[in-house]
Structure formats: C-alpha cells, structure tokens
Amino acid sequence: IRDSSTSRGSEMCIRDRSFAAEFNIDDAITRVNTDDYYYDRSEMVKAAGSFSEFAKNYDLDVPQALELELMSKHIKELLSGKITYLPKYDMSGTAIRHDNYTLAKPSKIIISEGLFTLTEKVKDAFDFKIYVDIAEDIKKERFYVRAKERDLGDSADYIYKNANEKAAVHIRPCKAYADIVLSGSADRIKYKNFLNRIIAVIQEVYFAE
C-alpha cells in the first residue's frame, strides 16, 4: 500500500487492525512500516540545531534516504518463516532509528505502507499492491498539518516544493506497478466498502475453516 500523502494508506492499515481484532487473528497479520527504514540521522539533526534546519540540507524525499535493502531482507526472512526484529523510526523530529526494536513473527499476511513501498528495491517482495492517488490540493493540506506537528517552521515551503518534485520522479511512476489504483478523495463510504471487499477475500482465502 502506498500513496504520496499516506493518510489513506494509513486508513487501510487501521481497517486491517479492526479486521484482525474482529476475527481474533492479529497473530496472522504482520505489519512492516516502510517509514521505519529511514536511516538514523540524529547526529546530523543535533549538529544542525533542529530538525527544520537539518531538513533544509538533507533530502528525505528520495528512496536513498531509506535502507530499503534491509526492509526487503526482513520481508524475505518473514516469508521464509524466521522471527525478525524490525527497526522503529522516531517521526517526532529527532531522526533517531532504533534498530532491532519490534519483534515480528512470520504470518500468512504481511502488510506494508509508506511513500516508497512500491519503489524498485522492495516492490517485488509483495504479491498484491495498492496505490492511493491523492489530489494535489489534499496532499498540500495534509502536508502542512504534519509540518506544523513536526515544527518545520520556515522550512515547510521548501520541503513541500522539494517533496512534490521528487514525488514526480520517485513515487508517482510507481502507480504503474500497482494491481489496484484507488482515488484518495473518493467518498469514504465507497472507500470502506472496497476495503471490506478486500478483507472478505483475505478472510476467504486465508482464514476459511
């Protein structure tokens, strides 16, 4: 699951948690968050004095900002039946990544979401891919909400412009790899109905008695 403004991708993952709780199958679903694979740049943030100053000179909007090879390795380990420890990235503005943080057990279903989930180094790890296409005005609104939460200050405009330009190169072309493309501005009821259909298929294929 990926989109260039992850709110709807996150909504899909929230819905999968509801499904897991409803059918008491949480152990049958493993979640691997792409954003947790950002490299640790905490020392660079400290040297810059703040995350907003750091972000002016470090590009977080390219696949090279993440250790996607490690993500692919972890998914392959899970698929081979191995217990794996996943990293956890602090999104509060410290740029700290805690390695070997989250215990992940092999399961029938592995779900991942994030900006770079369908890029070259990890896309082949997934059997089924969903791209959520977000209108430009909605993406911009969501970005500035997050920018305020992360205290980006006067760096926000530059970061948004850079993110939009890089998305045109690294993210939007990934739509071609998706099995299904969803409209991120679709009616929520229709959107949830679609998710319920996907979940019904998962239930039938993987959890039918």
Where are these regions (language model features)?
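Receiver (REC) domain switch/active-site residues of two-component response regulators
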Residues: D35, D127, D179
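Anionic, Ser/Thr-rich low-complexity intrinsically disordered regions
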Residues: D137, D154-N162
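ATP-dependent NMP and nucleoside kinases share a basic, alpha-helical "lid"
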Residues: I96-R150
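Single conserved hydrophobic/aromatic residue that forms the stacking wall/gate
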Residues: I1-G9, I14
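Conserved catalytic segments around the Walker B and adjacent sensor/switch elements
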Residues: I25-N33
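A conserved segment at the C-terminal end of the G1
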Residues: R15-D26
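NTP-dependent small-molecule kinase module
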Residues: S18, K105-P106, D124, Y144-K148, ...
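Conserved nucleotide-sensing/catalytic segment adjacent to the nucleotide-binding pocket
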Residues: T30, Y39-M91
